[in-house]
Structure formats: structure tokens, C-alpha cells
Swiss-Prot record:
One of its GO terms (biological process) is biosynthetic process. The gene is gch3. PANTHER family: GTP CYCLOHYDROLASE III (PTHR42202:SF1). Belongs to the archaeal-type GTP cyclohydrolase family. Catalyzes the formation of 2-amino-5-formylamino-6-ribofuranosylamino-4(3H)-pyrimidinone ribonucleotide monophosphate and inorganic phosphate from GTP. Also has an independent pyrophosphate phosphohydrolase activity. This is GTP cyclohydrolase III. It is an enzyme of class 3 (hydrolase). It holds the Pfam family GCH_III. It comes from Natronomonas pharaonis (strain ATCC 35678 / DSM 2160 / CIP 103997 / JCM 8858 / NBRC 14720 / NCIMB 2260 / Gabara).
């Protein structure tokens, strides 16, 4: 059974900060957000986790293996590098969606995202080392079948983007509501999903649903391990097996 540790990352009082003392240039805000994501990706990635940008002012990380001290150090590093601070909330559950729900509730209980007095909150209890297993995290790595041939080499970039995003949006909704899983677009034609130990039939159903609904064909490699990065690398290798053997779903062997 999976046991996913999810950390919600939220920039403190970000909306008001972007317009104080007057509205800040959008290009500067986009630069800050992208740099913060890059730094968090490295800070969490160096500890075998994954972070997904979602809306940039709110990000979702899979942090199995990171304890409370590691979270506090990440907070401190952000505070030292940026004119903004971040709050972190940790949830744990076999269901990634439920884990994120717990993390969200804890942070909302601490105050509004736009409360200037609510800064650098750190809440939640990470998984104890004695409770960790080699099957805690299931990562599924989806990509679009022949995205280059169907879209990149045939359509203008915006129309290609629309097709890829339609596939992502439909998969994201389906996986959330049918499988309690969290799916994230990670660039190109790639989607990474954090899943609740679902089986091959469930992945096939998801792929069929997306194809029937928006006409985007997908394949997926699935990995299972004790950290997000280890499971993610296993999923990438399984996806290569899909390409080599022309299959829709492969689990890491």
C-alpha cells in the first residue's frame, strides 16, 4: 500500500505583496516565480523529492524522506534568498489527494494566504523513518503518443499547446476523481501523476477516457519506491519499455 507524504508550499501574503506599494511589473513577478520554483525543485530534489509548480504561488511537493528539520531548512533558505517567505504544510495518506487535503486544511487553519501576520508556518507530521517502506510512492509518467509527428511538426505552437493541454486537463480531472491521484504537467508532452497504488486496468481506463473525450492518445510508465525520485526514475524506464514494445502501460520490472 502506498503512503504518500505531500507538502503544500504557499507563498505568504503574495497577492498583496505584488501590488505594494504599487503594482509590480509582471515580467519581474514571472521571473521571481520561476526562480523560486527552480530553487525549490533543487532543494527538494536534492533530498529525493519532487515539486510541481501548479499555480506557482502554491506548489505541491512529494516529500517522502524529508523530515521536519529538512522542511525548516528549505524555508530558511527561501527566506534568505527572496523578498517573500513560504509556508509549508505536510500531509500523509495512502491517497495523494487526501494527503494534500490534510496539508491544505492545516495551512488554512493557520490563517488566510493573504494574512500578513501568517508567515513561515510549518505544520504536519512527516512519516517516521521506522514506518517507511519501499512501496510508499507510486509515480506514473504519461506522455503523448507521437506528439512531434501529430502536433509539433504539423501545427503552429499554440495549437499544439492546446491539444497537449486538453489531454492534460482531462487526465488531471479523471485521475483526481476516479483514482484519488494528483497529476501535473511537467513540460513538453509529459505528465507526472502521484497515485494511490492503482493497477494496470485503472491506467488503461484513464488512457481510454482521455482518448475518447479529447482525442489525445497517451501511454504510461509506472514506478513504485520509497521516494518520489526513485519511483519517478523507475517510471521513466517503464515508459521507455512502452516505446520499445509499443504498449500503453508498463510497470517497472
Amino acid at each position: 500500500m502506498t503512503n504518500t507524504q505531500v507538502t503544500l508550499v504557499q507563498i505568504d501574503n503574495y497577492g498583496p505583496w505584488t501590488v505594494t506599494p504599487e503594482p509590480r511589473r509582471e515580467v519581474d513577478l514571472q521571473t521571481l516565480q520561476s526562480r523560486l520554483y527552480a530553487d525549490l525543485s533543487q532543494l527538494i530534489g536534492n533530498r529525493m523529492g519532487y515539486v510541481f509548480f501548479t499555480r506557482f504561488d502554491n506548489m505541491v511537493a512529494v516529500t517522502n524522506g524529508l523530515d521536519a528539520d529538512a522542511h525548516a531548512l528549505i524555508q530558511e533558505s527561501v527566506g534568505n534568498r527572496y523578498p517573500v517567505t513560504v509556508s509549508l504544510s505536510i500531509g500523509v495518506d495512502s491517497s495523494p489527494a487526501a494527503a494534500l487535503g490534510t496539508a491544505t486544511d492545516q495551512l488554512q487553519d493557520a490563517g488566510s494566504a493573504q494574512d500578513k501576520g501568517r508567515t513561515e508556518i510549518l505544520r504536519g507530521d512527516p512519516i517516521q523513518p521506522s514506518e517507511r517502506t519501499d512501496t510508499d510512492v507510486q509515480i506514473a509518467h504519461f506522455d503523448v503518443n507521437d506528439a512531434t509527428g501529430k502536433y509539433t511538426d504539423q501545427l503552429n505552437e499554440f495549437d499544439s499547446f492546446i491539444n497537449i493541454e486538453q489531454g492534460y486537463a482531462e487526465l488531471m480531472r479523471y485521475m483526481r476523481h476516479e483514482n484519488d491521484s494528483l497529476s501535473f504537467f511537467v513540460g513538453g508532452d509529459n505528465i507526472i501523476a502521484v497515485c494511490d497504488g492503482i493497477d494496470e486496468a485503472a491506467y488503461l481506463d484513464a488512457i481510454e477516457h482521455v482518448n475518447e473525450t479529447v482525442g489525445v492518445e497517451l501511454k504510461v510508465g509506472v514506478g513504485l519506491d520509497r521516494t518520489a525520485q526513485a519511483a519517478g526514475m523507475a517510471a521513466k524506464h517503464a515508459l521507455e519499455t512502452c516505446r520499445e514494445e509499443n504498449t500503453d502501460v508498463e510497470f517497472a520490472r
